[in-house]
Swiss-Prot record:
This is Uncharacterized protein 102. It comes from Sulfolobus islandicus rod-shaped virus 1. Gene3D superfamilies: 3.30.160.300. It comes from the Viruses. It holds the Pfam family DUF1374. InterPro entries: SIFV_Orf14.
Length: 102
């Protein structure tokens, strides 16, 4: 998969209300740069990061409207000037009334 293809998939996921979730587990690590990763994730409303051995698991939360929260989780490792993405999981869920934007 090329960078542009992944960018289109993420765009369609955010724009298509019928697409509730997706999961990509790359057979070969998807290689990009720090700036490429920042471009793919855009501007999330909040983020959480944990490190598990060498792998980074980062959750990005987007408040698209009053009813829906969109979440992406990237599983990746860092090399010298490179990011190696192993898996991306995205889903949409109803926003709880008590859930405030952070």
């Amino acid at each position: 998969m090329e960078f542009e293809d992944l960018d289109v998939v993420l765009y369609v996921f955010f724009e298509n209300p019928e697409m509730k979730s997706f999961e990509f587990e790359f057979k070969q690590l998807f290689e990009t740069t720090e700036s490429g990763l920042r471009y793919l994730i855009g501007v999330p409303d909040s983020r959480n990061k944990i490190k598990n051995n060498n792998e980074i698991i980062e959750e990005f939360i987007y408040y698209q409207n009053d009813d829906i929260v969109t979440k992406l989780i990237f599983y990746y490792t860092k090399g010298t000037n490179r990011i190696y993405i192993r898996k991306i999981y995205g889903w949409k869920e109803k926003r709880l009334e008590s859930e405030d934007e952070e």
